[in-house]
């Protein structure tokens, strides 16, 4: 092989994109952007397959309650260090900006909509993490109803990290859920982020086996 070809094989697609932008080659830059998007989501899918296999194997061998512990540990080690700002004293507008960013800039997902009413913000999204798994013909799901699966059977093992971390653990830490996840058909999900945590309806506490503390 030619040395030049070997050298070119070492260059990341991001560096190729930077060079195309610097040269003003918009056609190549757009093609590379599409390739990055395609490869990112395809490779993410391989990780989802892996995670689902691991969670299913653990549930089968150790029982479903072991998944609750795994999701809690993952919450402390991975999720709260990155998303703990949601429980800080920042404006609800800043919270929704940051929450949207996690979808658009971390997942690389374009949201269906962000809506606002007097009480809350609503995010509508075709979820390409847990929502993607729920589109598979087979995947790990709860055989029994647990507080950490919103009191329901047939909840995706992967998706259960949402009620465990952002509802149960958030209530333990701050007294209220970070946001509320509501899986929908066709891999979609609706998230509610209440502007004033005191206005989160009690039903959302009950569905994860928690009690809402009333102001004295």
Question: What do these predicted regions represent?
Answer:
Residues 1-160, 165, 171-188, 196-216:
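N-terminal accessory segment detector
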């Amino acid at each position: 092989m030619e040395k030049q070809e070997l050298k070119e094989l070492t260059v990341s697609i991001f560096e190729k994109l930077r060079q195309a932008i610097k040269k003003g080659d918009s056609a190549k830059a757009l093609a590379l952007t599409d390739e990055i998007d395609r490869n990112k989501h395809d490779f993410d899918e391989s990780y989802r397959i892996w995670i689902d296999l691991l969670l299913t194997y653990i549930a089968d061998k150790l029982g479903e309650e072991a998944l609750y512990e795994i999701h809690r540990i993952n919450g402390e080690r991975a999720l709260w260090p990155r998303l703990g700002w949601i429980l800080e004293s920042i404006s609800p507008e800043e919270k929704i900006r940051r929450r949207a960013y996690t979808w658009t800039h971390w997942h690389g997902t374009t949201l269906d909509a962000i809506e606002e009413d007097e009480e809350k913000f609503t995010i509508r999204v075709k979820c390409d993490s847990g929502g993607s798994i729920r589109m598979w013909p087979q995947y790990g799901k709860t055989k029994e109803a647990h507080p950490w699966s919103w009191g329901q059977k047939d909840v995706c093992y992967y998706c259960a990290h949402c009620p465990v971390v952002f509802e149960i653990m958030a209530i333990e830490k701050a007294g209220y859920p970070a946001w509320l996840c509501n899986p929908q058909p066709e891999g979609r999900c609706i998230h509610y982020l209440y502007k004033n945590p005191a206005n989160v309806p009690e039903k959302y506490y009950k569905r994860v086996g928690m009690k809402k503390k009333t102001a004295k």
